[in-house]
Amino acid sequence: MPLPFGLKLKRTRRYTVSSKSCLVARIQLLNNEFVEFTLSVESTGQESLEAVAQRLELREVTYFSLWYYNKQNQRRWVDLEKPLKKQLDKHALEPTVYFGVLFYVPSVSQLQQEITRYQYYLQLKKDILEGNLPCTLEHAIQLAGLAVQADFGDFDQYESQDFLQKFALLPVAWLQDEKVLEEAAQKVALLHQKYRGLTAPEAELLYMQEVERMDGYGEESYPAKDSQGSDISIGACLDGIFVKHKNGRPPVVFRWHDIANMSHNKSFFALELANKEETIQFQTEDMETAKYVWRLCVARHKFYRLNQCSLQTQAATLNSVRRDSSSRMSLPKPQPYAMPPPPQLHYNGHYTEPFASSQDNIFVPNKNGFYCHSQTSLDRTQIDLSGRIRNGSVYSAHSTNSLNTLQPYLQPSPMSSNPSITGSDVMRPDSLPSHRHSALIPPSYRPTPDYETVMKQLNRGMVHADRHSHSLRNLNIGSSYAYSRPDALVYSQPEIREHPHLTSPQSAHYPFNLNYSFHSQSPYPYPAERRPVVGAVSVPELTNVQLQAQDYPAPNIMRTQVYRPPPPYPYPRPANSTPDLSRHLYISSSNPDLITRRVHHSVQTFQEDSLPVAHSLQEVSEPLTAARHAHLQKRNSIEIAGLTHGFEGLRLKERTVSASAADVAPRTFSAGSQSSVFSDKMKQEGTEEQEGGRYSHKKSLSDATMLIDSSEEDEDLEEDSSREQAISAVSEPRLTAAFSQELNYPCASATPITGPLHIFEPKPHVTEPEKRAKDISPVHLVVETHRPRRDGLLTPSMSESDLTTSGRYRARRDSVKKRPVSDLLSGKKSAVEGLPPLGGMKKTRADAKKIGPLKLAALNGLSLSRLPLPDEGKEVSTRATNDERCKVLEQRLEQGMVFTEYERILKKRLVDGECSTARLPENAERNRFQDVLPYDDARVELVPTKENNTGYINASHIKVSVSGIEWDYIATQGPLQNTCQDFWQMVWEQGVAIIAMVTAEEEGGREKSFRYWPRLGSRHNTVTYGRFKITTRFRTDSGCYATTGLKMKHLLTGQERTVWHLQYTDWPEHGCPEDLKGFLSYLEEIQSVRRHTNSTSEPKSHNPPLLVHCSAGVGRTGVVILSEIMVACLEHNEVLDIPRVLDMLRQQRMMLVQTLGQYTFVYRVLIQFLKSSRLI
């Protein structure tokens, strides 16, 4: 078809990645190796860092970050919260990003993971060689001797030390003088001989300990000028912020605990000291530099504050027992014509770790129940020294083997790959004892092999089929690092191998075959030429060897392992995975982790994501059918029909409502028909699941294509379905009335009580249907009934009748109130934030279109007259994965069910809602709003005083139990000028350690909360309220929230306490925050401070309540409390029933979560939390 205006487009067969939608991030690692990742243009620096961490199998990512050279050729750390592409386009000199250590530690004993220590060693060595860390020549030679021993092993493996001439020994400052280099090489050779016998981890440890004692360790400085105009260098170090003068004056260090606040203004960077009422300013080059220095120092301070406790308590004891079996070994001398490779076998677990990282425990049951972690490959390879074997993918899946639980059989390690940062070794097979299963365990972070190289080696007979490990059943991808971080970007295919019966003589003594695998890379750690680009995703090595499956039945393995199916890949996947699956015609069907996981994608997403590999799946199908054994038949949660037609026949069983139930369901029901249809539906679902159990796998999808539920969970579901059938058969007549009453409630469901969530109510209110369902049902089958509405119809979320103008009148003295009475009486000020004025309920046709048909119908008094859909009518099950929960929440938002759900929750108690104390005339002026009052049985009672003889404050106790853990809150209004003394009395008497403030002092020119704590840095940093003296000790701004440390002193007794004040500063005047990650970080800060205070508090006040307040103490306060409780439900895998929890909260304080917008915001927060933690 011709284009208009005579335009012609050039037709090509090339596919070009558009720069507008993709970013190829080129990242240089600490060993000078380059990796590339294909990311989205919106991918943040954090996502790129996590991709690198996955590539390295690095879990302790806290200490590392990414940096680049700016256009002035200066190093700048990437802002991890912002898109990487925008930062590089705006500031970077070149698109290359570098991986390195950002936060240094006082002692390497803090580093738990071996790969973390190794990367840390590489960073320190780079700092020395590049001259970033100044040192003397003698010190550099000593460090070079340790580095040679760490990287090359014992000196007697080599005929001469000439290779040291090509090894980077000294800092760049001395590389120009050949005489100095020659003398230094001789001294290094002598030191190398002196250090003979040291293993690589021991040499690296000595190297890092030497560097730790050097001046300038962990420092990063920038040029600036002081107040006198003198040139200085200012930067951050371990202890604080240092200032080095260039005129010979001694350096000055401002320690972290002496710094009260840091700020920047234009090109000035300022420090506010806690002990002195002064501010020290420094002038940087420009405004961007001042902001960057401030951001870096704030990050260093936060790292110091969060880690100072753990730094003091961590032990640095060596585990000498594990060293014997997991240390790196020196290698024999290779053939004389070849340059000897660096003999470096990385050890596992040099320090005592909370998890086992060696195969030593493979025969011993783990009694402490810690997470056991294997990064090893026990696959011995017949090696020809004329070639190199590189085995392993970019990311090796971890194995739990038989470490977590005592099992009746011994299971060999999966054929996990061993990608490494530096080189490894080639060892003669005859030099290895075949009976030692754990003496040679290389780490699992070695370079990715080229697929063609592996195939050539296979063709040359370098890999023998009878020497492979033959188990893949326990490839625990879910516990690996790639699934423990949010939004991981890079995925690799695990190596899938099948093996015949073990016939070799050395394997007769053990029920598994012990194999070894060693790898090598370029012999020069610092080559002159550029390293080849290493792909971000490896090609799986698929070996055609027959499977021996009868020794280890898959169902037994699945029962003995604690398994959580990993979440699906996000769509669209940022990282490109390019294995040619169509060439691999044989793939193991013995691994339940790879082929039995629940499908989480929708049909459309599944089709779009999976069509490119349809051809390869068809080819894979038949070998799988042939290799399948009878006892390996497992239920499949999906059916794939018509694979050659583009997966049009994909049917999700668990999401499908049977046609018979749909046809039977009319528009309206009588009570009896509702109950019968409900029970029939359950029976049909159970029948479907039982029929599904007869299916066995005939087609397997790639792990990057789809995920299917494991057999263990299928069995549990089958038992649950049969149990529910029996329950429904017994309880059907009794549930008729209760079920018919609340049929329209979107979250009504029949659920066996497991006791995940408890409410502490002084006076419980249970209706008769609830009592009958609880008392009569033999297994406590409860239909989630709620209190009947006044008229059974939907009501607006907050109407003006709920907040009458007469109710807003408060008898306040003129000297106390901060606003004119006309504002109160005119309705301008309301406890409801963002509420339209009176008469604003009239909608134009355009407005009606905006609010959607469901909301419009509800506002006109129409309610649902159909059975709720499966996803609507039940809370999110505890068995659901994070991705399923996220999908259900998103569906409720998209379908408008959140609105209906919110409108059905009572705003106040209908019975026993007494507020008699709050309505007393003497307490009227203590209420910010006359219609937001605490219930008598839930209010916080103060010790009566002469000024407050009733002990009243507008605050309510809120208690909720999640998974046996009690969450205790105090929800209160923002203090008034005349209630500050009562506020601090409540803090003292209730033992409050954390105050969460979710408002500003003023918004839109109106007071939201009186400032009840003193400002930092002012002359009056101490204020007294009655018997309490409050002092501000420090304040830290962290973007969307500020953390302030307060000292509270009781003047009569002299006792002092520390109170943390966490103020969320990013809430807009109207609506809710847009930055969901920022709000989640605020909740994380609350959790972090709560853990800190609980660990340091006295046992009698081990769990003090969290005090939360906004202006009225119901809107934003309810959002914080509800969000934190629901996040706790997600973390403890409890039932996710948001409306029920909110109803519980409102039974303790009225009108919590005031508006629909706030309620929707809670959903968005939970969705963001699930998306961020879906890979954990």
From Swiss-Prot:
- Which residues lie within the region annotated Disordered? 668-703, 789-825
Which amino acids does the record list as binding substrate?
A: 1069, 1110-1116, 1154
| Spans traversing the lipid bilayer | none
All copies of domain Tyrosine-protein phosphatase, residue ranges = 898-1169
Q: Give the enzyme's main class according to its UniProt record, as a single word.
A: hydrolase
Compositional bias, Basic residues, is annotated for: 809-819
Any GO MF annotation of the entry = protein tyrosine phosphatase activity
The protein's name is Tyrosine-protein phosphatase non-receptor type 21
Species:
Mus musculus
Q: What is the lineage of its organism?
A: Eukaryota, Metazoa, Chordata, Craniata, Vertebrata
Task: Write the gene name.
Answer: Ptpn21
